[in-house]
């Protein structure tokens, strides 16, 4: 049974771990001692590096997926916002993102409980956000969730690919950024071989360590470098409203990484333990993003307005090269996080999601990478593209739709009475929850989508007018 479990993981079948773990333990007692020992050894190695599903795995996945390349663009956002607004928006959107991630987790548990009461078996099926919406609210909600979620994850993958090319250029500028995009597109395509979020255990752990190093490198390097001439941090939006709301929307994007919440929960052995995980992950992420962005802005001030990648302003040293390499590896991992749900959707569309072998599924997934590759070459605007995606996609995908879906699901009195996860009294019960949801919808609709969409569009069009589509080397210094 244990060896079958290992094969199941490799093939990408998503079996309930608690039931299977119990069966494995029971069978191991009655098997031959030598065979049982070998199986246990294989299973131990697989579990250590390959097969995660604990609360800690979920925490590492959430934190690792949330921070990634945005660490390098947040100083740019601070230069657009000013120090006080930059700090305030990070804390505010961090809390708001944690709230909507909690709502998504509640809806997942509600959907899964209802379906399992109807004897639906999810052993060979990964539940996704659009299916939760479909099961709870119907096909119109499903279509909206599918459209926004897939489009966001598509561009989220594009952003990781753009970031890879932008970063590697700072340690090897013999090739332009567009050529590096081609190269890293081929490298990132290897994520088709990772079956599910179960299998990111060691990668999410290493990814977070790598980004932690990069964050503290930025902080220390900025302080050691000291203030440049003319670096006078502003306290508010003293430039233009376009810059201000573009920066705010980039932070909205930063804390909107919970579009993969359902897939992470489904990979857990006990998904109901997820409720506070995203908040805990956000708390750690803030210890990385706040010091690094504040220190960089303190040191370089308005110079960041023309350098959306923080690496561009720091002198080349072995410490910076190490940070670049580690960030590249983490961006490869984050590309997999963003792309894996798209792989699942595509597998379901062409009918290979259930029981196909790992090689067949990998081959079937390859077409998903091609449009990502193409879009990264068309729009290589590292930094401005984050705000555009944040305003038009993140606003709806992980803020507005979850809040509205939660209210619609539990609007009937019977649904509230029979809720699997009723809101805690500390949050005001149902009235407090509904009030918080209404605030999220109104705020994000007006500030994130409205003002943020306007500002991000203006800024994005400026980048196109200045650099053009398919530009070979976005924001590269002139060669002498």
From Swiss-Prot:
This is Putative auxin transporter-like protein 4. InterPro entries: AA_transpt_TM. Its main location: membrane. GO terms for cellular component: membrane; plasma membrane. GO terms for biological process: amino acid transmembrane transport; auxin-activated signaling pathway. Keywords: Amino-acid transport, Auxin signaling pathway, Cell membrane, Membrane, Symport, Transmembrane, Transmembrane helix, Transport. Pfam families: Aa_trans. Carrier protein involved in proton-driven auxin influx. May mediate the formation of auxin gradient from developing leaves (site of auxin biosynthesis) to tips. Residues 1-66, 108-143, 201-203, 263-275, 345-365, 409-433 are cytoplasmic. The chain crosses the membrane at residues 67-84, 87-107, 144-164, 180-200, 204-224, 242-262, 276-296, 324-344, 366-386, 388-408, 434-454. It is found in: Cell membrane. Belongs to the amino acid/polyamine transporter 2 family. Amino acid/auxin permease (AAAP) (TC 2.A.18.1) subfamily. PANTHER family: OS05G0424000 PROTEIN-RELATED. Residues 85-86, 165-179, 225-241, 297-323, 387, 455-480 are extracellular. It comes from Oryza sativa subsp. japonica. It is a multi-pass membrane protein. One of its GO terms (molecular function) is amino acid transmembrane transporter activity.
């Amino acid at each position: 049974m244990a060896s079958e479990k290992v094969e199941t993981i490799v093939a990408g079948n998503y079996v309930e771990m608690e039931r299977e773990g119990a069966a494995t333990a029971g069978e191991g007692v009655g098997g031959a001692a030598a065979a049982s020992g070998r199986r246990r050894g294989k299973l131990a190695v697989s579990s250590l590096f390959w097969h995660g599903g604990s609360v800690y795995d979920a925490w590492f996945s959430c934190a690792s997926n949330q921070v990634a390349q945005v660490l390098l663009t947040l100083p740019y956002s601070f230069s657009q916002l000013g120090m006080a607004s930059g700090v305030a928006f990070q804390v505010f959107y961090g809390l708001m993102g944690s709230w909507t991630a909690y709502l998504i987790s509640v809806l997942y548990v509600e959907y899964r409980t209802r379906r399992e009461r109807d004897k639906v078996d999810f052993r060979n099926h990964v539940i996704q956000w659009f299916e939760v919406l479909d099961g709870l609210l119907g096909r119109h909600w499903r279509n909206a969730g599918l459209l926004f979620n897939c489009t966001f994850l598509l561009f989220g993958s594009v952003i990781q690919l753009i970031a890879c090319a932008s970063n590697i250029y700072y340690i090897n500028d013999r090739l332009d950024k567009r050529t590096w995009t081609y190269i890293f597109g081929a490298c990132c395509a290897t994520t088709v071989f990772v079956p599910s979020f179960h299998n990111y255990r060691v990668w999410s752990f290493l990814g977070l360590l790598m980004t932690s190093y990069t964050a503290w490198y930025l902080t220390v390097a900025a302080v050691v470098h000291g203030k440049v001439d003319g670096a006078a941090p502003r306290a508010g939006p003293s430039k233009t409203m376009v810059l201000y709301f573009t920066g705010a929307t980039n932070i909205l994007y930063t804390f909107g990484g919970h579009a993969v919440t359902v897939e992470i929960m489904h990979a857990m052995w006990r998904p109901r333990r997820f409720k506070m995980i995203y908040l805990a992950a956000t708390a750690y992420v803030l210890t990385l993003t706040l010091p690094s962005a504040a220190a960089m802005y303190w040191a370089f001030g308005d110079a960041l307005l023309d350098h959306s990648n923080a690496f561009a302003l720091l002198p080349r040293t072995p410490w910076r090269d190490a940070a670049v390499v580690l960030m590249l590896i983490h961006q490869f991992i984050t590309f997999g996080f963003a792309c894996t749900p798209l792989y699942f959707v595509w597998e379901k569309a062409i009918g290979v999601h259930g029981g196909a072998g790992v090689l067949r599924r990998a081959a079937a997934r390859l077409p998903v990478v091609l449009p990502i590759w193409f879009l990264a070459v068309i729009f290589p605007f590292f930094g401005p593209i984050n705000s555009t995606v944040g305003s038009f996609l993140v606003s709806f995908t992980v803020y507005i739709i979850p809040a509205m879906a939660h209210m619609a699901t539990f609007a009937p009195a019977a649904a509230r009475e029979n809720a699997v996860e009723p809101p805690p009294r500390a949050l005001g019960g149902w009235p407090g929850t509904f009030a918080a949801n209404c605030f999220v919808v109104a705020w994000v609709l007006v500030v994130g989508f409205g003002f943020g969409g306007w500002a991000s569009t203006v800024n994005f069009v400026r980048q196109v007018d200045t650099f053009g589509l398919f530009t070979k080397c976005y924001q590269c210094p002139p060669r002498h």
